[in-house]
Amino acid sequence: MNHERSRGLYDRALSVMPGGVNSSVRATMPHPFFIERGDGGHVIDADGNRYVDWVMGYGPLLYGHDLPDPVQAAIQSHVAAGPMYGAPTEIEVEHAEFVARHVPSVESIRFVNSGTEATVSAVRLARGHTGRDKIVVMQGGYHGAQESTLVEGSPGDAHPSTKGIPESFAEHTLPIPFNDPQAAKKVFAEHGDDIAAVLVEPILANMGIVTPIDGYHETLRDLCDDHDSLLVFDEVITGFRVGGLGCAQSKFGVTPDVTTFGKIIGGGFPVGAIGGQAEIIEEFTPAGDVFQSGTFSGHPVTMAAGKASLEYAAENDVYEHVNRLGRKLREGITEICTERAPEYTVVGTDSMFKTIFTRDAPDDPDACCAGGCRQNPDCDRYDTCPKNGADVARAATDRWERVFWQEMKEQGVFLTANQFECQFTSYAHTEEDVEETLAAYREAI
């Protein structure tokens, strides 16, 4: 493939933007390819190269790059009426009502502008509600670019994971391993009276996709109940993608006190939201004393796109389609890995998928969950499948970025550029896209 124009755009970008990108995850070696437009389940770059797109904007694009007619009409109608008003609109009430009808944890909701803003606000809300400071997070989990959760280490030895965050911030954050009930019990035994909340993704979706072992979320729910702490599910990625309109919390049968949203809830436009029990959410100003505000919050175009997107999913076979393609991809990649790289682990659920380049092969190379790792203790791979962020970090992460991703790109398949970010199917993808992708996997694995 020719990437001459992308190279030139990157050189220009480097002169006016740090690293040549506006989000560090978009930086790739030797340089990013610049997208000119989307077309269904594909993107076309500045040099005219076409790719099957499984990145889907890192999750927001449930419908790919061609929005259904009702969604397009809703967006255009609100754009034509004026960009924004600095006052409430009916569409934000309607969108809130739809979410509250379908998501088990949501009685009340506050819309904001990004997933990061949602999790920042949720942490502040939990502290304000409980009068406590400490937040339990998962090692390897990700909750946006916020000071309270950009922390690594362990309880008692936590430190910021980036420059620019005071060490004192980490004193209030307690990182524990995902899928380790004993670690959760220990941190509550030692700090329970000071813990405002447990903040957890139902599925670790920024760490190669790690699903919970049986009973893990129930353990967190019980511990929070026993210590009057809040259980906060970060469903920025899984919301309205895993578990359909009920989100991942309905799939796992565990109801948090507070849920954060982003991505799909805005129909492809910038968005975030914090939902939960009314008595908790109403502690946000002006109803309560926990400050939260934003110029663009509840933006009418975003609200229209989000509401119309979810309504279309409720009335059509959207989830059946994307989940079927997701399973077909995972099954196909599993078959390829069994033949060519039995040490690799295929992960994902519903419309999410990823291959983790784990290093330890099982004794029986045919032993695997065909539709993606389900943390099944009866599976012969159970002990080698990643259970937490540290397990994924021990994989051959460098090979993904330097070799595998490059090869897939040259074969016209756009995947997330590192081992940790997950990939997504959309309503615009086809069986042919799946077959083309599996053929590329056979060459690249």
UniProtKB/Swiss-Prot annotation:
Listed InterPro entries: 4pyrrol_synth_GluAld_NH2Trfase, Aminotrans_3, Aminotrans_3_PPA_site, PyrdxlP-dep_Trfase, PyrdxlP-dep_Trfase_major, PyrdxlP-dep_Trfase_small
Membrane-crossing residue ranges in chain numbering: none
Superkingdom of source: Archaea
Subcellular location: Cytoplasm
GO biological process: protoporphyrinogen IX biosynthetic process
Alphabetically ordered keywords of this record: Cytoplasm, Isomerase, Porphyrin biosynthesis, Pyridoxal phosphate
Gene Ontology cellular component list: cytoplasm
Pathway participation: Porphyrin-containing compound metabolism; protoporphyrin-IX biosynthesis; 5-aminolevulinate from L-glutamyl-tRNA(Glu): step 2/2
Modified residue annotations for N6-(pyridoxal phosphate)lysine: K263
CDD domains to which the protein is assigned, alphabetical: OAT_like (cd00610)
Pfam families the UniProt entry points to: Aminotran_3 (PF00202)
Cofactors named for this entry: pyridoxal 5'-phosphate
Assigned EC number: 5.4.3.8
MF terms (GO), sorted A to Z: glutamate-1-semialdehyde 2,1-aminomutase activity; pyridoxal phosphate binding; transaminase activity
Catalysed reactions, as listed in the record: (S)-4-amino-5-oxopentanoate = 5-aminolevulinate
NCBIfam families named among the record's database cross-references: PRK00062.1
Similarity remark: Belongs to the class-III pyridoxal-phosphate-dependent aminotransferase family. HemL subfamily.
Protein name, as recorded: Glutamate-1-semialdehyde 2,1-aminomutase
Taxonomic source organism: Halorubrum lacusprofundi (strain ATCC 49239 / DSM 5036 / JCM 8891 / ACAM 34)
